[in-house]
Amino acid sequence: MKYEKLFQPGKIGNLELRNRVVMTAMGALMGDWNGCTTPEQIRFYEDRAKGGCGLIIPEFTSVDADSGHCNPIQLGIYDSRQIKSFQLICEAVHRHGAKIFIQLHHGGREAPPACNGGRQAMAPSMELNSVVGRATILPREMTIEDIDNLVEKYVQAAVNSELAGADGVEVHAAHGYLVQQFLSPYTNKRTDEYGGSMENRCRFLVRILTGIRAAVSRDFVVGARINGNDFVEGGNDLAACTEIAKYLEPYVDYFNVSCGVYASAPTMIEPCYSPEGWRKDLAKTIKAAVHVPVIAVNTIKHPETAERFLQEGVSDFVGMSRMQLADPEVVKKAMAGREDLIRKCLGCMNCNKSVVAGKNLHCAINPVTGRATVYGDENLVKTGAGRTVAVVGGGPGGMQAALLLKKRGYYPVIFESRDHLGGSAVLASKAPCKGMVAELIETMKAEMKEYHIEVRLNTPATVETLRALDPYCVVVACGGDQIVPNIPGVDRSNVYYIEDVLLRRVSFEGKNIAVIGGGHVGLEVAHFLCDNNKVTVVEMQKEVGVTIYRTARYKLLSLLAESGVEVLTEHAIAGVTDGAVELRKTDTGAVVTRPADIVIMALGNRPDKSYEQQLKDAFDKVVFVGDANKGGTMADATLSAYENCWFF
């Protein structure tokens, strides 16, 4: 049997789960301003339960009306409206055979005053928070009365969770939030009974857990999410976290092992530059030291990896959250042996980026995530009646458009001038740490085959070719043309473009290389070239990678710095000569010369407006997706396919 353990039932306390797959908590931010759920949020969790997940732990849920909120629309479980609201989520999850725990949360020093009626954040000690890319918050030190009050509120929140129909609660004691701030010497500088020794630092959490256990029913599950490592100097390392787990074991039914705090944010929610399963030793060590079940999050991207980790004793249950953002049916598809149809998380951080921007939780490769009440299949306008639609371009945007149009009843035909599908994503997949993009292309190709979508490779979409098809509509998803700067020397033999590098048409060793353009692609090309070369990234803006989400940017820039890549900002390319580049300082206009044996242009793409106009002149209905629409990211490509092909 391929999945001997992954789809085997398992128990936490006296509660049996149908399999070992857990959707661990993540900020979905689909609630309302009263801390209550919304139809979109209910649908979000219901779809994952319907997809086969065994246990769902919704996003962090506030225990206090007056403090600890980390977002103005964070869910709460402290009043009667919220209890009734959570009943809807619990009923939806139970309806499809999954179980649900509510994660109890207080932000402590991470709770902005703006989200808490202007009130100052409170924490074990007056220690500034430290966040990658975010301003600091100075909390006040909690009094004993504050501690006593919050213990009561955690206990009441657990009681409310049981009233709402949940199967258990998880106290959030990780990620630099309040309870973890008590646990870690990095943030706990107290000298009373709540600080100093490990036992004292655990006292707040022990009081919460014992209070909850005394207040809820016997079979109601009580667990804790803990760190396996804080990954900050002065914090708890793996050995310390293991001792904490051993000390807390008598008070919990399970542990959910994660890692990191806001000062080490790239370890909490890892971008693609961290390999799958990189943190597995954290959970494995803690599991070996305790006798209660352990859930572990390990940036799982493949069900096969989840099975292997269960076999290796890394954990008893597997957290697969971002995996289920990308594809809510990952469990069903794996059980059916259709792994080829699973859209797997890229680690692109679009989900976190959307939440930080104040939007619903969205996924770059699944535009329905966070938009299911609008773009769910039950809302499809099936007016195609078999009419033909020409889709120009076989990248992710084009394939997404074709898939949607097929579901709407049209007959899409993809025209791709190259001998393969994938478009510019093929280039992206060649950069270091971007293998998941290649897997996405293969998955989308499998979808084209599964839905019997006609694909014409090596077929440029000229006006004449398209006219021969007599299409009802033309969808243009052909991407853009690379930007070539109008400068002296741009046509010299030592000037190359990103496809020359990433497709390995050329290779360099021992060269002084200037990469012109410090956007995402430019930085990744620099990463690609940094072995055995001296690489300099040249960017005209004040910073590089400004469109990259902050934790991914931090991680990528760290990798480049470790590899000796130089970053030169506020300089624009002015010319290329033999063995050098001429750069213009953007502040003074002065031109300086820098040595460069090789020059790589990584300035991005722009839509081909002349081709677009030809199509508009020739056909009545023409819509644009992806780069042909406005340029941008994978998320732009797939979402624009829905936005522009949902109805016409």
Set out the residue ranges of the language-model regions.
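Surface-exposed acidic, glycine/proline-enriched linker/cap segments
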Residues: 196-197, 371-385, 438-439, 500-512, ...
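Short, structured coil segments at secondary-structure junctions
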Residues: 251, 290, 313-314, 451, ...
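Conserved acidic residues
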Residues: 54, 167, 253, 316, ...
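Rossmann-like dinucleotide/flavin-binding elements
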Residues: 383-415, 456-470, 477-494, 499-548, ...
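Rossmann-like dinucleotide-binding cores of NAD(P)H-dependent redox enzymes
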Residues: 411-451, 527-571, 629
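Flavin-dependent oxidoreductase catalytic cores
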Residues: 1-392, 396, 400-407, 411-412, ...
